[in-house]
C-alpha cells in the first residue's frame, strides 16, 4: 500500500497511538522489515506528547502511571520523575501497571484524591485487541481520572494535536 501511495506521489504519515518516542517505533518497524525510507514518515502520540511536555512542563516533577517499557518516553527528563504521587506536579499516563492491567478499581483508588493535578495521557485508546485478548489502555485510566473530576490532556488519535503536529 505504501509503495502504491509513493508511486502515485501521495504524501502519507504513519500515525500511531504508541506512547513512545518516534525512534522507538521506527526501530520496531525496521525490525518487522519495513523499508527504512518509509520509517521516516512515522508520528507517535508519545512523540507529540514528549514535545509538549518539554515545552510546557519542563523541570516539573511528575508521577508515571504505566509499565516500565514506556520509560523511554521521559528518558531525557527522568530526573524529575517521583515515586510518590503526592510529591508530583502532574501525572503522565502511558498505560497500566503490569501487575494491575485488569483492575481499573486500582486506578480509581490511586487517583481519587489527586484530581488537583493535571494528567497527560499519551494514548487515548480505551482498549486494544491483541489477538483474541482485549486489554485496557491509558485512555481507560484517563477516563477514570476525568470521571473523578480531574483534568486530562490527551495526545493521540482522535485528538487534534497529533494531526497538526504530524503534518
Where are these regions (language model features)?
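HAD-like aspartate-dependent phosphatase fold
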Residues: 1-167
Amino acid at each position: 500500500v505504501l509503495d502504491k501511495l509513493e508511486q502515485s506521489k501521495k504524501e502519507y504519515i504513519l500515525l500511531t497511538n504508541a506512547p513512545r518516542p518516534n525512534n522507538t517505533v521506527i526501530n520496531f518497524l525496521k525490525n518487522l522489515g519495513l523499508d527504512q525510507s518509509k520509517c521516516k514518515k512515522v508520528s507517535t502520540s508519545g512523540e507529540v506528547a514528549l514535545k509538549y511536555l518539554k515545552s510546557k512542563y519542563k523541570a516539573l516533577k511528575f508521577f508515571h502511571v504505566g509499565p516500565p517499557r514506556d520509560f523511554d518516553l521521559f528518558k531525557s527528563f527522568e530526573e524529575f520523575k517521583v515515586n510518590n504521587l503526592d510529591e508530583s506536579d502532574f501525572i503522565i499516563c502511558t498505560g497500566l501497571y503490569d501487575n494491575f492491567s485488569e483492575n481499573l478499581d486500582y486506578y480509581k483508588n490511586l487517583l481519587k484524591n489527586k484530581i488537583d493535578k493535571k494528567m497527560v495521557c499519551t494514548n487515548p485508546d480505551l482498549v486494544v485487541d491483541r489477538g483474541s485478548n482485549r486489554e485496557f489502555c491509558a485512555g481507560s485510566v484517563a477516563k477514570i481520572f476525568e470521571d473523578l473530576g480531574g483534568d486530562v490532556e490527551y495526545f493521540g488519535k482522535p485528538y487534534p494535536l497529533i494531526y497538526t503536529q504530524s503534518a
